[in-house]
Amino acid sequence: YLYVTFVKPDEKMGTYVMIADRPDGPFRFAEGNGLFAPGVEGVDSPFIVNDIDGEPFIDDDGNGYLFWRRRLAARLSADRLHIEGEPLTMQTARQGYSEGPLMFKRKGIYYYVYTLSGNQNYVNAYMMSRESPLSGFVKPEGNDIFLFSAPENQVWGPGHGNIFYDEKTDEYIFLYLEYGDGGTTRQVYANRMEFNEDGTIKT
């Protein structure tokens, strides 16, 4: 399953579900025939949410969830193609525009990662829960912003990212885009994510 944001020629956008038999593809739309420009014959594939940055999370019990821009979230259907019920808003310690969400789980703790601000002012913050992917989140002890600009390393505006977990080494790698100084270059950076004894993320 691949959850992809597409912006059509008429500037309408959404997150779509694509599927493949192999992780390296080829991927096809899970439903419908594709996306078509206005005036072009064809029936559009339906979006799973009418917004960007759809990010799936599958819990240990097999239940799936989708998180997307503006802190919205919902449970996924069993076939992973639709959301169930009305979306809810994730509760976070910091307010303001947010996109690029991420959910992951480590040692029984759920981590909800979200961006704040934008452009060269992007930062990444997080919340923690021991309850469920959709509830019980609290601000971590210490600094809840774990990634921010580092001009000394020429890193400006670390934004939307994701986790790569290496089972062999038990390492968590956070990969993210870097906006750039003054104009976007969308470079990709990677940082090792380390944790304190209480599960909080080291900054």
Model segments located where?
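Carbohydrate-active catalytic/glycan-binding domains of CAZyme proteins
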Residues: 1-203
